[in-house]
């Protein structure tokens, strides 16, 4: 599957090529770290988020809803976006400036839990048992001082854990924060989040949905597999973009990005352990059987 004349590791990204000198177990551990792979759909979403972040303050700030199936890669995109815009410290005022605050919607959402989760995210000491008005006042005071440009709320489909009245209250809270702080709010969740927001005409118009869909067989997916292969410290090229391997990967994972990453990482581990040093169809099939 590889050209024997190729220089060992020539198919790898430069930093990954250096890992080939490590013992097998160290290479396997290195593969288990989180990795970021640029691909067109993710880049498009990151560009959309960047445009939101750059929007000048106005009365009605633009917002959006990023949705897709569980493990499709939504959270990884948000983490990449947050990493690209780290906080700074205002030495003169002694205040941390965070352009982006990213949090998770509590599993059982209500105002008290939401404010407590937000305060926890920004590192603000507080009593979770305090009254809603106290938590709200503390949150508003701190956020006005920090001047964030964007609030990201992941797992927003947890809204559906509440009854209709509680869902409306949580949605009104999100609109209130966007208006009060004049910042964009980005909601992230599964398709259930779309259902929840569609029950409120104002929310559905305020938060236009953008979907991160499953992968299908395409040139873009082959480019993704090629980019992923460059980050796996195997001594030989696996040529993952070959049609038979592409179809095996899609059949085993359903086109879910997180499942694809897990499949390829485990297959690469098998390739290291059996000394073949390249992912073959047999490795993919073996991992698929173990995880079925």
Feature locations, PLM:
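A short, basic N-terminal segment
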Residues: 1-62, 280, 285-292
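C-terminal alpha-helical "lid" subdomain
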Residues: 1-19, 71, 218-219, 226-292
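Post-Walker A helix-loop "phosphate-sensing" segment adjacent to the P-loop in P-loop NTPases
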Residues: 83-94, 124-125
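Walker A/P-loop nucleotide-binding motif
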Residues: 58-80
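Mid-core helix/loop region of P-loop NTP-binding domains shared across ATPases and GTPases
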Residues: 7, 14-23, 46, 110-114, ...
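A short hydrophobic beta-strand->loop->alpha-helix junction that borders the nucleotide-binding pocket
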Residues: 96-109
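The catalytic "switch" region of P-loop NTPases
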Residues: 160, 172-244
């Amino acid at each position: 599957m590889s050209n024997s004349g190729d220089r060992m590791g020539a198919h790898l990204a430069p930093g990954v090529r250096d890992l080939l000198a490590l013992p097998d177990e160290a290479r396997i551990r290195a593969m288990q770290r989180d990795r970021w792979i640029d691909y067109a759909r993710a880049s498009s979403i990151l560009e959309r988020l960047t445009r939101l972040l750059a929007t000048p303050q106005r009365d009605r700030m633009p917002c959006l809803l990023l949705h897709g199936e569980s493990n499709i890669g939504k959270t990884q995109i948000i983490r990449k976006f947050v990493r690209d815009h780290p906080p700074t410290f205002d030495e003169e005022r002694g205040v941390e400036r965070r352009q982006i605050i990213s949090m998770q919607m509590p599993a059982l959402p209500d105002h008290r839990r939401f404010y407590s989760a937000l305060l926890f995210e920004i590192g603000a000491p507080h009593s979770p048992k305090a009254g809603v008005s106290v938590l709200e006042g503390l949150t508003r005071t701190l956020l006005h001082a920090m001047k964030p440009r964007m609030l990201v709320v992941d797992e927003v489909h947890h809204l559906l854990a509440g009854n209709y009245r509680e869902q409306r209250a949580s949605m009104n809270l999100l609109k209130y924060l966007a208006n009060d702080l004049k910042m964009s709010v980005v909601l992230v969740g599964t398709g259930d989040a779309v259902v929840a927001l569609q029950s409120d005409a104002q929310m559905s118009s305020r938060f236009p949905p953008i979907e991160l869909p499953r992968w299908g067989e395409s040139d873009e997916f082959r480019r993704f597999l090629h980019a992923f292969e460059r980050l796996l410290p195997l001594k030989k090229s696996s040529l993952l973009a070959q049609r038979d391997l592409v179809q095996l990967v899609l059949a085993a994972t359903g086109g879910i990005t997180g499942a694809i990453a897990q499949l390829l990482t485990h297959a690469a581990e098998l390739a290291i352990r059996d000394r073949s040093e390249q992912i073959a169809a047999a490795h993919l099939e073996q991992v698929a059987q173990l995880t079925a």
